[in-house]
Amino acid sequence: MKQFKSHCLPVHIANEGMESISAFLDGEERQQIDNAPWHDFGNLPQVSFSLAHNQQGIYLKYRVMEKHMLARYKNINDPVYKDSCVEFFIAFGDDEHYYNFEFNAIGTALCGYGEGKNDRKDLPVAILATINTLSTVEHQDAETGLYNWELTLFFPFSVFIYHSISDLTEQQCSINFYKCGDELPEPHFLSWAPIKHPYPEFHLPAQFGLVVFE
């Protein structure tokens, strides 16, 4: 099973705001989202993430370079997976249910909870509005032809409404991270932990990897 370790982000840095959080995550190990089992042709984006935590919540930063970019959806729980989208799914303890968090390049969120793809409950808009985001998007580079965008996220523990969490130190969680873009000119479906499935599908908790919170 693929796994990595998440370090503690000092509270005083977190309290300085999203730019300080983003800078801290730049110093953490970068995990690559580069498994593309359903890719036959075209260009693949370059995607990485860094993850940290503390007694306030979970901190996550994505970095993306891709040929095409869409960021059309602006309302919480819109179908952002049709845009340029990054995602992470997480299950706590032995729970067979998991949360799915999906964001387009401007930070619009689609999030749910359930046991499988067809058993999702949208998280309340008021709850999702408490997720802090910092998005930076650079126009298409004249030399490489690629868009560069980054998304930094802070998930307070209160977002995980079906669990009572105050600290994840010395705990492990099942997890996977993804990049997709269903309606891009060249659709793609990438994951951090490998997936074995005949067609693109992210809702496969049995194939999640593992994060160890130090």
Regions found by a protein language model. Give the residues of each.
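Structural preference for beta-rich elements and adjacent junctions enriched in aromatics
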Residues: 1-214
